[in-house]
Regions:
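Structural beta-sheet core signal
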Residues: 7, 34-36, 111-113, 137, ...
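Alpha-helix initiation/capping motif
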Residues: 42, 125-128, 192
């Protein structure tokens, strides 16, 4: 609870999510530092959440050069909300430098929806990607989370419900599916304490 929280936000909707989280935590516990990577015009969502944050007289720093990088202590917690699932090309320039800088720190890194530098549905091999300790992703796992080469970047994954209509998710077209405990649970029937293994069929591997 006493750890300093450093938010690094982009200018898109993922950055807007980061600013919204920063606002809630600022009201809850303080000790929050907020940095926005200047990468072009801000999305409407980002602008809205920045405005709400400024109403709290929050101090927001813009990062334009490496000289604007803050000191990151090993005891700090970095919340990264730079690009999310909207990334379409490998990181370069100031974004790449910032991610490399964060990777050199020993701080705990929490990525929002998708670690910066990671593509949502293709391999990011040989790209610069932030090494998240935790990834808080929204509504459903991303294909990138299933790729072996991405294991060192995603850390511990939590899938969060953000209120999207269940029907929207169910009707989304995809050729990729995952199996979890909840989806297979109906196949397992209650067993008596003294049952024999041959009472429950056979499995062919």
């Amino acid at each position: 609870h006493n750890k300093k929280l450093l938010f690094f936000c982009g200018s898109g909707n993922n950055g807007g999510d980061g600013l919204a989280i920063a606002r809630l935590l600022l009201k809850e516990r303080g000790n929050v530092a907020i940095y926005i990577l200047k990468t072009g015009s801000r999305s409407i969502d980002c602008e809205l959440n920045l405005h709400r944050l400024m109403e709290l007289q929050a101090l927001v720093h813009e990062i334009e050069t490496a000289d604007n990088f803050p000191e990151i202590d090993g005891e700090d917690v970095v919340i990264e909300a730079l690009f999310g699932t909207g990334l379409s090309k490998p990181l370069e320039g100031m974004a790449q430098m910032l991610v490399q800088y964060m990777n050199e720190s020993e701080a705990t890194v929490v990525s929002i929806d998708m670690p910066a530098g990671l593509f949502a549905d293709t391999s990011s091999k040989d790209c610069t990607v932030i090494k998240a300790t935790h990834t808080l992703s929204f509504e459903c796992p991303k294909l990138a989370f299933m790729m072996t080469e991405n294991g060192e970047y995603i850390g511990n994954i939590s899938i969060l419900d953000i209120g999207l209509h269940k029907k929207y998710c169910e009707e989304s077209i995809t050729d990729t599916y995952s199996i979890d405990h909840e989806s297979v649970q109906p196949f397992f029937k209650p067993r008596k304490a003294f049952s024999h293994k041959y009472n429950f069929g056979h499995a062919l591997l």
